[in-house]
UniProtKB/Swiss-Prot annotation:
Oligomer and partners: Homodimer.
Keyword Transferase among UniProt keywords: yes
Record-given protein name: 8-amino-7-oxononanoate synthase
Lineage, top ranks: Bacteria, Pseudomonadati, Pseudomonadota, Gammaproteobacteria, Pseudomonadales
Family recorded in the similarity comment: Belongs to the class-II pyridoxal-phosphate-dependent aminotransferase family. BioF subfamily.
Length: 401
């Protein structure tokens, strides 16, 4: 029996869905070198510009000198070091919750939390546009799994009325491909009224959102009662690596006992925890980063709308430009790259069919001049793409004549 991998790959290519890894040959930042080409990048999730911050680098270096490089073992054996513990305490205080628990990746945090809380005989309900890790977690948990309409409390309520056992409602805080926010106050009210727990993965909210960078929960003024399970990642707004779950004493102890991705994984390097402690300090202290980022977002949206581009309803650093077809999105990204601009083309199955887009992401490390350069390149590339499509249509009509 053959797996016929060649045919599967050929099909991906034919559908303009084949993915390749760009090779980054520089540090993260607005100005990068990718595959040997200097580019101005608008595709990183380093929203506050902390990934290459000198103080964060110094903290990582000092942590490696003091604690070594590897975690050495799982947290439950001998891998839970001083910096890990200190970071968990700091994240608990930052989120206003009794406890926090570190995970090596956001994917693992989501898998671990969902599977530890629900199983056979229970129910997990998720937004249909949730991140793949959340959807995988629901499917793998063994619980009855259903998706409600995107950001629709009424759709959620209808599914909650049919739920069985312990019920977990799961949503992204900021939707990673659209940039819009979950309607947390309404979702929380619906969940509470029916005795369900709400779990929020705020991977893209921590850092940019909230007065102190506390994310979507701080943005809406909600607490642990409304959102019992709060997930955050450290590789985006924090600029380092890893993830955490914040919640009650009982929640965190339950995860330590039952979350398999936590139990059976080597801890992250303690030096990374040292770096994250410094980035957390900067995230909270330097509010100018959020203010500058908000100004850049407004500048970009104003300029893009003036160009006639189709934007999505987002005031976050994620600013998608809806294109439609996968081939057109890839072509537009290529035209930008020829002008020295790097923006990711996002295609199905990451997004629904016929909704391919350019996913522009802005950072506090960008300048106004760099945003203006992006807008200029977008205008030129969009006109070029429109001319190419018109020429193709005319050629097809000529063939049919």
């Amino acid at each position: 029996m053959s797996f016929d991998l060649a045919s599967r790959l050929a099909s991906r290519r034919a559908e303009d869905l084949y993915r390749q890894r760009p090779l980054l040959e520089s540090a993260q930042g607005p100005d990068v070198v990718v595959d040997g080409q200097p580019l101005l990048a608008f595709c990183s999730n380093d929203y506050l510009g902390l990934a290459n911050h000198p103080e964060v680098i110094a903290a990582l270096r000092a942590g490696a000198e003091r604690w070594g490089v590897g975690g050495g073992a799982s947290h439950l054996v001998v891998g839970h070091s001083g910096p890990h513990h200190e970071l968990e305490l700091a994240l608990a205080e930052f989120t206003g919750r009794p406890r926090a628990l570190l995970f090596s990746t956001g994917y693992m945090a989501n898998l671990g939390a969902v599977a530890a809380l629900v199983g056979k005989g229970d129910t997990v309900l998720e937004d249909r546009l949730n991140h793949a890790s959340l959807l995988d977690a629901g499917l793998l948990s063994g619980a009855r799994f259903s998706r409600y309409l995107h950001n629709d409390p009424a759709s959620l309520a209808a599914r909650l009325d049919k739920a069985e056992g312990n019920t977990l409602v799961v949503t992204d805080g900021v939707f990673s491909m659209d940039g819009n926010l979950a309607d947390l106050p309404a979702l929380a009210a619906v969940a509470q009224a029916r005795g369900a727990w709400l779990m929020v993965d705020d991977a893209h909210g921590f850092g940019p959102l909230g007065a102190s960078g506390g994310g979507i929960v701080e943005h809406f003024g909600l607490g642990q009662e409304q959102v019992p399970v709060l997930i955050g990642t450290l590789g985006k707004g924090f600029g380092t690596a890893g993830a955490f779950v914040a919640g009650s004493e009982e929640l965190i102890e339950t995860l330590i006992q039952y979350a398999r991705p936590y139990i059976y994984t080597t801890s992250q390097p303690p030096a990374v925890a040292c770096a994250t402690l410094k980035s957390l300090e900067l995230l909270r202290r330097e509010s100018w980063r959020r203010q500058h980022l908000a100004a850049l977002i407004a500048r970009f949206r104003h300029g893009a709308e003036a160009l006639g581009l189709t934007l999505m309803d987002s005031f976050t650093p994620i600013q998608p430009i809806l294109v439609g077809g996968s081939r057109q999105a890839v072509a537009l990204a290529g035209m930008l790259r020829a002008r020295g601009i790097m923006v990711g083309a996002i295609r199905p199955p990451t997004v629904p069919a016929n909704s391919a887009r350019l996913r522009v992401t802005l950072s506090a490390a960008h300048s106004e001049a760099q945003v203006d350069r992006l807008l200029e390149a977008l205008g030129e590339s969009w006109r070029q793409l429109s001319s190419s499509l018109l020429a193709e249509i005319e050629a097809e009509e000529g063939d049919d004549a």
